[in-house]
Every structure is written in structure tokens, then in C-alpha cells.
Amino acid sequence: MLSRMANSSDIDLTYKLVIGLFNAAPGKLNLAALLSAIDRGLSLSQVGDALDSTVVFTQEIIGDLSEANQVSLIMSHFGLVEGQSTGNDRKLVRDYFTERLKTGDSWGQIVYDAITYLSGNPDPRFAKAAVLLNNKALVAQIYSQSYVEANLNVLQHVLAGVSADDIFDQAAAEAYLEGIGKPAGAVELTQAKD
């Protein structure tokens, strides 16, 4: 396997991959591990496959959910829920995700394809999902530069209030984090363990 350095696009898509699968910020340590895997030669879709094979994903995210409920859950990570998107748009995505699962594709590959699509020039009907994904990615990026948290509930809470109502810039993302008690640039102290 050839070694390479993760570029800015890889880094952005890594945040989005974690968001799509876990609806969470990665945190500093998890992000470093993911980028190290890319530096060792893994593609982002391979990283997605590795993430969807983790105990956290298989037990804490999808657990015992039916296929239909798994689809609904992953759709919610992109804001594709009632009140935030139209029924036709949700049906289109639901059918797409379900068909991909039935053909044997992994959640890692499906989410990778979804984030790549939303990061490009998506159909205008998915503009709000793209804005939400970008806003979450910016918040996750700023958060993960300062915080080493690895607890899934905490990492999900970081993004819980992010919306697609406005397009976030750096200042808006920092204000959001300040509002949830996670100011940008904070130094997080950790307790040493013997």
C-alpha cells in the first residue's frame, strides 16, 4: 500500500464521513487516527468501511435496528426528516439507501457516496442537506482542533443543535460552540491514568 498525506479535501470528507455514520464530531484523537489511516494509504471509502465495522457503529448506532430504521437513522444525520425536507425527497433517498443495502453495499460506502454527492453540486432539492452537512463539518472541525473527547454521546451532542437555517462561517460556528460550552481554542486538560 502506498503512503500519502491526507489533503484538505480528505480532511473535510473525513469529518463528513464521521457525521454521516455517527452524527458526531470525531474529536482530536479519533480524527488523528482516521487521518493516519489515510496517510498509510487507505482511501476514504475504505475508511468508511472500517468505521461501519466498529463496535460503536454496529452496536451503539445501528444496534438491533431493522433495515428500514437504519435507513431512517442515517437519513436523519443529513436532516432528511419530516419537517426539514419534503416527503418526495425523503422517499427518493430512502429508496436509494435501501436499494444500495439490498445489493450488498456497506453503510460506509453508501455514506461515502452521499457525502461526496452533497459536497459537489447536488440537485437543488438537496441543498438544505448539503448546508447542514457543511455546517456540521465546520463545527466538528473547530471542535476537534481543541477537544480529545471520545465519548459518543458527547461527540453527538456537539452537533445536536446545528441546523441548516443559515450557512455557517467560522464566526458562526465558533459562536455555536461557545453557546454549548465548548469554546474554540480551549485547552482540554486530561487526567493521567496510572
List the predicted regions and their residue ranges.
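Substrate/cofactor-recognition hotspot
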Residues: 2-194
